[in-house]
From Swiss-Prot:
Tissue specificity field: Expressed in seedlings, roots, cotyledons, leaves, stems, buds and flowers.
Domain EF-hand: residue ranges: 372-407
EC top class, as a word: oxidoreductase
Membrane topology label: Peripheral membrane protein
Catalytic activity: a quinone + NADH + H(+) = a quinol + NAD(+); a ubiquinone + NADH + H(+) = a ubiquinol + NAD(+)
UniProt motif (Microbody targeting signal) ranges: 562-571
Pfam families: NDH2_C, Pyr_redox_2
EC number per UniProt: 1.6.5.9
Protein's UniProt name: External alternative NAD(P)H-ubiquinone oxidoreductase B1, mitochondrial
Amino acid sequence: MTLLSSLGRASRSAPLASKLLLLGTLSGGSIVAYADANEEANKKEEHKKKKVVVLGTGWAGISFLKDLDITSYDVQVVSPQNYFAFTPLLPSVTCGTVEARSIVESVRNITKKKNGEIELWEADCFKIDHVNQKVHCRPVFKDDPEASQEFSLGYDYLIVAVGAQVNTFGTPGVLENCHFLKEVEDAQRIRRGVIDCFEKAILPGLTEEQRRRKLHFVIVGGGPTGVEFAAELHDFIIEDITKIYPSVKELVKITLIQSGDHILNTFDERISSFAEQKFTRDGIDVQTGMRVMSVTDKDITVKVKSSGELVSIPHGLILWSTGVGTRPVISDFMEQVGQGGRRAVATNEWLQVTGCENVYAVGDCASIAQRKILGDIANIFKAADADNSGTLTMEELEGVVDDIIVRYPQVELYLKSKHMRHINDLLADSEGNARKEVDIEAFKLALSEADSQMKTLPATAQVAAQQGAYLAKCFNRMEQCKELPEGPKRFRTGGHHQFRPFQYKHFGQFAPLGGDQAAAELPGDWVSAGKSAQWLWYSVYASKQVSWRTRALVVSDWTRRYIFGRDSSRI
């Protein structure tokens, strides 16, 4: 008892280090050893985690964040919005078919993880400093001096997924007088603008000419966005608006202006033709072969390509949807890395920015610079020629065929275009007989046209989502694939690539055309148009929602619209 009392008094009066030493002595040093081991493990864990900064919360950024194993990374996200928007339904938001809140989901809800945390900063990145591995950001809260101070973030890996902005082609008056449809806020402004046009048109004191001008809705661009908005607007006016404003229903007009020869020119010709015929029946004026020269608050001037004639068209509201342009931060970054003058950042097939090994670019702000097989023919031939005989046997070729197909996907597309199954079919002689061996000239000749199948991927949500998911998979297997590379052979330097290159899989595309009709183009040359395609569109878009909450809200909005119609209130 005396010994214990003495130890107690000593413990109370001794410093912390002495207490640990005393306790460690009594317990054989196990506690001190545990403390040291625990501290060592924490340091090791912190050392392991690489800093990943993600710019943007669109399709590419969210797909990456959803699939990334963040136990291995310290993840920070910079985005001017704290939500993800299901952008394919933006045309539906413009007319109240779907409410804006129904297609957005908080990024913080999407990125909830059990074994880690993702930090989100609501800010704009205005400069990427790839030399010092930093991004410089500006908070979006400009009206609050305390919350608007610029800051910078360091990174080990940077994921650039900032998307693109509208391309005005330098046309005078577009920025000042046109609506765009890239964000949820754009859709809400258009919805208010449409209602405003009708409210103004029924005011007393206006001439019929003034009323017609205010009720003339012009869409510039015959791509999916422009066509879907035209269809939604037509349904909104016919099914709902004219019942509320019957006095001006005969004055309403919708015009779709397209510079090309046909609308929906990225779709199958059958769909393009069906869409034009349906719009004509619906009274939508489709004007093709016209180029917009300038826009004012009352008129839009277009040039007829066939005759060169300039035509002035009065308007009440214009939607400009003519493709995508480059954001200033991307233009500045491209100048830094020697890519000035491009529309999008050039990446390799692994989505790494050319010249920046630890910077990746995905989505609308990036474009894959596919490697041409003709530039590597000599290296491929040398790698396959195991006995250095100067000729390739079919057995030697078999050893590299899979690597060729993976590394150069244009070869597989070329084979399909020729209705062939195997590279050996390309190497057949002039009479179609299989060869036993080929020299380098015959090998080069057989693949000389393969690069003609190289195509730039479209700036769509489907492409961006697949790129984000692919990149997350690569990051999740980063350490594993350093030791055991899973990619194709490196024909120039030997060894194997760390990962398989990104390969886009096209699952088809839809074009809602109004009147409960849509057009669908699916793999395998499957084309459908009509009500069945519209119901397929409903099911696919409902299934692709990012959460059960948005899925339920979107389906509920569709049901509400069928029962009660669209709301025409201007809020």
